[in-house]
Amino acid sequence: MSYLNASKNKKAPKTKKEIFKVVIKWLKVFGFLFILVSMLWGCVQMYQAQYSVNQIVDMTGKSVYTPGVSFEIILSSLGEQGSKVHHFVYDKGSFFEYGYNAITSWKETFKLTQSPFYGFFVYPTAWILAGMIKLFSGTLNPLLDKSSQLTYGISSIFAIFLTTLLIKGITLSFGWKSQINQEKMQDIQLKVADIQAKYKDKKDMQSKQKQQLEIQALYKKENMSQFSALAGSFAPLPFLFAIYAIVRSTRALKIASVGPIALIEGPWQQITAGNYIYIIILAIYLPLQAVSMLLPTLLQMKKQKSITLTEAQKKSRKKQLIMQVVMMFVFIIIIVSVATGVCIYWIFSSILQIIQTYAFYLYNEKKRKAGNQERQRRLRQMERMNLK
């Protein structure tokens, strides 16, 4: 089946509403490109010497993260106090002092980093996160006694949760339409698989262009955008990298711990060092990550259980499942090697993603059933009219 319109009628002039839609569309495209460029910029910048966060060797010979060295973000506008701490290391017969590079304001962030990633993502998110920590604990400069440290650590967990909730709301706005029309998007993907199967053995440029035009026509016919699904998938990534940078470099989180679990330490690194308490983090994270990534496909398979799929559609669904499993393992490998605070952020993010996926699934099922009932009602009404 072809979704191309053979009609060559002249296009009518665009209305103001249509022009407005085009403007919004291009703003979204430029916004998406800005986010993508910022993310890539940040990925490179985080590992440059002046922005890297390194462990120091303490007096016992143990490698640890500590405030007052390397790159650090201090939220002075929230009353946070911090400065360089003089740590030295003995190497090759000489003593060397660890470097220190601090940012204390939003203006300074743009001036020193000249980076949209740190300016628009890292510092504002760090300010919100640290502000919530201060709201719950009353301070960003906790005392060293166990009670104060525990209160501060628990406050940091709550702050990460609320920040995750805020980020989820922002990223959901990028893919709201595709989420609200999740069932339609899944049906479109099956139809796209059929179109791709139709042109599978055709390698000439004309056939490839025709395939792309058919796919575009299909999305247009269903009043859906290919971009919305793509933007929804990429939107969380800059915030994930921002949280990674924040947990490692923000003083407020460098000093945060809940009992023996420090938010800046990597769980896998600590487990291999004999601190098995960090297994708790991975035991919570791993199943949640698996469920959050596989749930959409599993729900789709459940819904389409009674539907007879074409061979191309079966292959497409299998390919989709394999890709999700691969992505799941990639995320698992990445997350277990980063700071515990990032793992906690991703635990909350996975929980919210599971709730979001299932909520939209229930919404779409309810909408589908209501539509079926309405169709049945109209059919019965037409039958009664025909009998008369």
Swiss-Prot record:
Its main location: membrane. GO terms for cellular component: plasma membrane. CDD domains: 5TM_YidC_Alb3. It is a multi-pass membrane protein. GO terms for biological process: protein insertion into membrane; protein transport. InterPro entries: YidC/ALB3/OXA1/COX18, YidC/Oxa/ALB_C, YidC_ALB_C. It holds the Pfam family 60KD_IMP. It is found in: Cell membrane. GO terms for molecular function: membrane insertase activity. The keyword Transmembrane applies. Keywords: Cell membrane, Chaperone, Membrane, Protein transport, Transmembrane, Transmembrane helix, Transport. Disulfide bonds: none annotated. The chain crosses the membrane at residues 22-42, 116-136, 156-176, 227-247, 279-299, 328-348. Belongs to the OXA1/ALB3/YidC family. Type 1 subfamily. Interacts with the Sec translocase complex via SecD. Specifically interacts with transmembrane segments of nascent integral membrane proteins during membrane integration. Required for the insertion and/or proper folding and/or complex formation of integral membrane proteins into the membrane. Involved in integration of membrane proteins that insert both dependently and independently of the Sec translocase complex, as well as at least some lipoproteins. Aids folding of multispanning membrane proteins. This is Membrane protein insertase YidC.
